[in-house]
Amino acid sequence: MSLDQFLTRLDQLQSDADSAFTSASDAAALEEARVTFLGAKKGQLKDIQKMLGGIEKADKPAAGAKLNAVKSAINAAFEDAQQNLSGGDDSGADPTFDPTLPGTRPSLGHIHPITQTISHLTEIMGRMGFEVAEGPEVEDPWHNFVALNIPEDHPARDPLDNFYLATAKDPSGKSSVSAGDEGSQLLRSQTSTVQIRVMKQVEPPIRIISLGRVYRPDAPDATHFPMFHQMEGLLVDTNVTMANLKTVLRVFANNYLGEDVEIRFRPSFFPFTEPSVEVDFLWNGTWIEFGGAGMIDPNVFAAVGYDPEKVSGFAFGLGVERLCMRRHGITDIRDLYSGDLRFLKQF
């Protein structure tokens, strides 16, 4: 190839590249044109560069100089086209935009107050050596009632006070549970079912808490809801007394509600504890009931295979919502389950 032919090819390549870059309507088209002319492997400039070897030796300096000049010109044309597509120097800038102002921080999620309370309770009880135990929310009557010393005729087993599940079917496809009868399963009405399952599997000493949902068909109002959370505590060992129970609850109350909180026991009755007490905390000058407690009834120990002559223990149950509401000054339990972000964002 002669020098004139080589120079003519370079001039034509530069002209074609200028036209392609100028006519590119968007970044994708401009990039396609760049690859066509400046591509490292198959670009047209690369192809012409390979022809330099066929130029006479005496003409190679002039051909090389022209090649470099055209390459620089094509690169400059590409950069100009790129700048034009992006709006130039300042022509596309919004005059009202101030880059020195801080950006808008995206909204962050909030942990639900019940979840916060459960985490706090778990931390407090964990410092006293209590481990978390879990159990199913769908239970059978033995774990929910029988093993807890609740007899068959006890009003707590009434279908009007529990969510029995009509899951058993007869061959005709109808439910085998008649109106007014207990079903083979129910939504647990208390987290005490977990202590039965743990004691059936583990030998003393035991020190556990169970936090979870329980279900009772209560009409929703400011203090009642069909589903709520309980914290059940269980300690089984030798020589456990009411003094141990009161100490644990006092330490818990001081950690959760403050050092100035006092505690008192009022005599009560629960089938699964004997003696049984209601637990009140003196908080902000008012005695407030938070739950029930007591020494585990020997019949409960017998149901799980423990010898009540060798071991003793206590159990307590506290309402998580009640603790949460008192701590945060919430007056209506329904607010916790309303899904109203205006309320939940406060926590």
UniProtKB/Swiss-Prot annotation:
Cofactor(s) annotated in UniProt: Mg(2+)
- Subcellular localization, as worded in the UniProt entry: Cytoplasm
Q: Where is this region: Disordered?
A: 83-111
Keyword annotations of the record: Aminoacyl-tRNA synthetase, ATP-binding, Cytoplasm, Ligase, Magnesium, Metal-binding, Nucleotide-binding, Protein biosynthesis
An example of a Gene Ontology cellular component annotation for this protein is:
cytoplasm
The record's principal subcellular location, in a coarse class, is cytoplasm
EC number(s) per UniProt? 6.1.1.20
The entry's family comment says: Belongs to the class-II aminoacyl-tRNA synthetase family. Phe-tRNA synthetase alpha subunit type 1 subfamily.
Return the protein name: Phenylalanine--tRNA ligase alpha subunit
Report the source organism: Rhodopirellula baltica (strain DSM 10527 / NCIMB 13988 / SH1)
